[in-house]
Design a protein with these regions (language model features):
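Mid-to-C-terminal alpha-helical segments outside catalytic/metal-binding sites
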Residues: 2-4, 8-12, 20-35, 47-69, ...
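Mid-domain alpha/beta scaffold segments of enzyme catalytic cores
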Residues: 23-134, 144, 148
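Conserved, mostly hydrophobic/aromatic
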Residues: 38, 58, 149, 181, ...
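Active-site environment of divalent metal-dependent phosphoester hydrolases
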Residues: 42-44, 73-76, 96-98, 133-136, ...
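Solvent-exposed, acidic/flexible segments
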Residues: 44-51, 69, 106, 110, ...
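A general structural detector for well-ordered alpha-helical segments in enzyme core domains, enriched
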Residues: 50-57, 75-79, 109-116, 141-145, ...
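Catalytic pocket-lining loop regions of alpha/beta-barrel enzymes
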Residues: 81, 89-91, 104, 136-235
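Active-site gating loops and adjacent loop-to-helix segments of metal-dependent hydrolytic enzymes
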Residues: 121-124, 199-202, 209, 250-256
Length: 280
């Protein structure tokens, strides 16, 4: 009996030492820099958050680079002019928030996109973030957007369901797509299946912290797909409304917390290395 108790105590002690060692290793590891692939700086933000304040928030949060799209595009270009090394511009096809619900069938939006790309040639590294769902991809506007993406060698940033992602690649297999929010509600199995199917699909994890790591603990399903596709996931926060700027540091802390539960090399890829490879 005493031997059994002693053996159990030794086993518990061993587990405690492993946990302690892991905690110490995490504490001693340098803080992960972040390449945030989901930032907006739209018109409602501009008065309360001038560019210098925005850049200060990013710096304090350890966001060394950011993929930025805005409604309208002027917000993105303003930030880029202030800090071109940190800010990577992409072109959102929204002149106002009202464009969100119909941009995919509005020739005027297409004209706006073409004009901005031409006027600022080489500045925008993608088109998006845009909202597009299954059954909406069969318009001339969407077809032309996919053609522009291939022609200009730039990415699409799609806030879409799984069906729309499939439809986009069916429309133009040469696309390079960043799937915003991992589909917002798609689970790790569905995300993994699309990554298996499309080698030029990447996934940003903005707004998915509570799904990826409920209660702060990395979900086993998400962990498995991260390990299976370590080169295809991207960190993100999403400042979709003005109040999100105050929430951004906390969101970044949550991202670092669940990434710390992965092997360091995988964590670094998701935190910044994958995005740096896409946007060198």
């Amino acid at each position: 009996m005493r031997l059994r108790i002693a053996a159990r105590l030794l086993a518990l002690l061993a587990l405690a030492l492993v946990a302690l060692g892991t905690a110490i290793t995490r504490a001693q590891s340098p803080e992960l820099p972040i390449f945030d692939t989901h930032i907006h700086y739209s018109a409602p933000d501009w008065i309360e958050y001038p560019p210098e304040r925005i850049l200060g928030i990013l710096e304090k949060a350890g966001i060394r680079r950011a993929l930025v799209s805005s409604t309208p595009d002027d917000g993105t270009l303003t930030l880029h002019a202030k800090d071109p090394k940190r800010i990577v511009p992409i072109l959102r096809p929204y002149r106002t928030r009202g464009d969100m619900g119909h941009w995919w069938q509005d020739p005027a939006v297409l004209a706006y996109v073409q004009e901005r790309l031409q006027k600022n040639r080489g500045v925008h590294k993608g088109i998006g973030e845009f909202h597009l769902f299954g059954g909406q991809t069969g318009t001339f506007v969407v077809k032309r957007i996919t053609e522009l993406a291939v022609q200009e060698n730039i990415y699409l940033h799609a806030h879409s369901d799984e069906l729309a992602i499939i439809e986009l690649f069916t429309l133009e297999p040469r696309l390079r797509v960043i799937w915003a929010h991992a589909g917002m509600s798609s689970g790790p199995q569905a995300v993994g299946a699309l990554l298996d199917r499309y080698p030029t699909l990447w996934v940003d994890l903005a707004i998915r912290n509570s799904d990826v790591a409920p209660g702060g603990t990395l979900d086993p399903g998400w962990r498995a797909v991260f390990l299976r596709h370590p080169d295809r996931f991207l960190a993100g926060t999403d400042t979709w409304m003005t109040s999100r700027w105050e929430a951004l540091p906390g969101s970044v802390t949550e991202v670092r917390s669940y990434l710390s539960q992965l092997p360091r090399d995988v964590a670094e890829k998701i935190a910044f290395r994958n995005a740096e490879r896409l946007f060198p």
